[in-house]
Amino acid sequence: MIQQQSLLNVADNSGARKLMCIRVVGGGNRRYAHIGDVIIAVVKDASPNMAVKKSDVVRAVVVRTKKGLRRDSGMSIRFDDNAAVIINQDGNPRGTRVFGPVARELRDKNFTKIVSLAPEVL
């Protein structure tokens, strides 16, 4: 569960390292974001000489959360960290690589490019 002021790791090579959520996209007053939801975030830490700079406002999709995700089969899945991938307006990732595992639910939400770049899909 990601809400405003939540800090997330960045799971791609766009240049950002840490994000802080400033808005959950969708619905009028939506409070929480889960895996596969789009957020608006500000870059809190970034690598030098990369495409994304510190204090940039970006769109990102949540790919991992510490809060467990319950599937229809009854299985529950949770990760060790909260992580997101920075995307552009079209929903494509700004980086060329994705680090760490991502959840299968991203495929259902039409983030197939992120799923194809990920080394492991759980």
Swiss-Prot record:
MF term (GO), any: large ribosomal subunit rRNA binding
Gene Ontology CC terms, in alphabetical order: cytosolic large ribosomal subunit
UniProt keywords, alphabetically: Ribonucleoprotein, Ribosomal protein, RNA-binding, rRNA-binding
A Gene Ontology biological process term: translation
Listed Pfam families: Ribosomal_L14 (PF00238)
InterPro entries for the chain: Ribosomal_uL14, Ribosomal_uL14_bac-type, Ribosomal_uL14_CS, Ribosomal_uL14_sf
Highest taxon, organism lineage: Bacteria
Oligomer status and interactors: Part of the 50S ribosomal subunit. Forms a cluster with proteins L3 and L19. In the 70S ribosome, L14 and L19 interact and together make contacts with the 16S rRNA in bridges B5 and B8.
Stated family: Belongs to the universal ribosomal protein uL14 family.
Function: Binds to 23S rRNA. Forms part of two intersubunit bridges in the 70S ribosome.
Name the UniProt record assigns to this protein: Large ribosomal subunit protein uL14
